[in-house]
Amino acid sequence: MRKNFGKKTWLYPMPVLIVTTYNEDGTPNAMNAAWGGVYDTDQIMLCLSQDHRTTGNIRARGAFTVSIADAAHAEACDYVGMVSGRKVPDKLARAGLHTERAETVDAPVIRELPLALECRLVRFNEDGI
């Protein structure tokens, strides 16, 4: 059955985007991002609050990865999005997820997830990165 949402700027269903970075001390960090999408033919854009540790990590290192959750890891990825890395520094391990260094950028990738975009920060503005 079709549903009319009126004029909106969002798409459904939205994938769960897991953004991973390295913290200052080199430990992996991850957060779920609800707002992101295609910016150009070879760029994506994320809308992240400046309050997130992940945002600071991206600005400091200039790199991050974006993975998309799959059905097999939905519960683990949901946990990553619900728990703050400031309160639970090992939240990836507690979720049963493991990371390895990305091939082309200074950021981790989550081994269990089938897709990872390796990204470099091109620009930052108050509308998103």
Label every model-predicted segment.
Residues 1-31, 37-129:
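Active-site-proximal mixed secondary-structure blocks
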